């Protein structure tokens, strides 16, 4: 039985169908769409647990219980990146204070609840269980153990036997994961855009994303003064033609509005976006308890029916010059 997706969980908290939530390693009050709705959902929750390495994220303010987690250098384990590469990460230092690794927190909780199957002696034992689940699949790492990872370096899966060097490139044997083992190319018969269409009230399409020096919701990178010198606050990138028509110039302050909320930010006029499209970075949350820089005030909760990914790249907005 599949559980709820991220956006569905907060809908359930808001309606009262779900009473409690345990948030691990994420800051949904900044990262999820329609932030003010997320905030109301957290306020409505009966019990909120936040497990993170930062106690200063926007979400931790709503935590009834804050579980301090260990950072990457403070715990042992493996990491798999987007090129299928598995790397062993050794523990360098002990975590500060009461902080524990995510694994330790979860296993301690499970044992307190008398759940079975959590009597792991080490992270290696957990990895071994995970690896065995991949046996005889297209992502087989059942033969890749800690010893090889520690002594031979990283591997790209699949690693289907003990002496296998890993698979830097897939399908070099020209055998694909189809019944015929031949590649199948499916051309779309139609292009379906279910996003809300711009109109006279909200004529611009807002797309959101990242900038060079910040990572996600800035709980780590936002503390590094040098990283804040490049772009110290969120800036709306606007096409020169749109800016000319609206009599807006670089460094002007504008109000950006959608059906979900508003933000107030500076403008940068640039050819980085096409006409009628504007860009705003998603990293900033509340500043001095004010949410006028929080981009996800604007975004909508429309999600893809298959992936459940929110429609972060397409929100209809209006833009007007700010007047004191």
Question: At which residue positions do the language-model features occur?
Answer:
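Acidic catalytic cores of enzymes that act on phosphate-bearing nucleotides/polynucleotides
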Residues: 1-14
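Long, contiguous, secondary-structure-rich segments that constitute the structural scaffold
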Residues: 4, 96-152, 217, 221-237, ...
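Short acidic, glycine-rich surface-loop motifs adjacent to enzyme active sites
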Residues: 17-29
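Short, well-ordered beta-strand core segments
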Residues: 21, 48, 66-68
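Glycine/threonine-rich flexible loop motifs
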Residues: 27-37, 77-80
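A short helix->loop->beta-strand "cap" motif at the edges of active sites that frequently abuts
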Residues: 43-47
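Flexible glycine/proline-rich, aromatic-decorated loop/lid segments
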Residues: 53-90
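Long, low-complexity segments enriched in small/aliphatic residues
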Residues: 126-226
């Amino acid at each position: 039985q599949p559980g709820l997706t991220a956006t569905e969980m907060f809908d359930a908290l808001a309606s009262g169908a779900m009473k409690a939530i345990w948030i691990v390693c994420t800051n949904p009050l900044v990262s999820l769409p329609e932030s003010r709705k997320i905030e109301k959902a957290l306020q409505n929750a009966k019990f909120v647990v936040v497990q993170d390495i930062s106690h200063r994220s926007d979400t931790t303010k709503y935590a009834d219980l804050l579980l301090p987690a260990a950072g990457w250098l403070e715990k042992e384990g493996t990491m798999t990146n987007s090129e299928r590469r598995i790397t062993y990460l050794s523990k360098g230092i002990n975590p500060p204070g009461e902080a524990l690794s995510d694994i330790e927190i979860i296993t301690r909780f499970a044992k307190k609840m008398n759940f079975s199957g959590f009597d792991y002696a080490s992270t290696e034992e957990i990895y071994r269980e995970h690896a065995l689940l991949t046996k005889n699949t297209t992502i087989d790492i059942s033969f890749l153990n800690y010893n090889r990872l520690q002594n031979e370096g990283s591997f790209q899966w699949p690693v289907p036997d003990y002496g296998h060097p890993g698979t830097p490139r897939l399908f070099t044997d020209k055998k694909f994961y189809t019944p015929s083992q031949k590649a199948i190319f499916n051309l779309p018969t139609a292009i379906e855009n279910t996003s809300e269409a711009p109109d006279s009230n909200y004529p611009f399409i807002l797309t959101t994303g990242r900038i060079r020096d910040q990572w996600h919701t800035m709980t780590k990178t936002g503390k590094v003064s040098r990283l804040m010198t490049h772009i110290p606050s969120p800036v709306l990138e606007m096409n020169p033609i749109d800016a000319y028509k609206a009599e807006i110039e670089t460094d002007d302050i504008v109000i950006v509005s959608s059906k979900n909320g508003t933000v107030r930010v500076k403008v940068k006029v640039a050819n980085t976006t096409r006409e009628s499209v504007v860009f705003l970075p998603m990293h900033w949350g509340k500043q001095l308890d004010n949410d006028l820089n929080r981009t996800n005030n604007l975004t909508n909760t429309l999600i893809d029916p298959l992936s459940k990914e929110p429609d972060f790249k397409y929100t209809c907005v209006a833009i007007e010059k700010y007047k004191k």
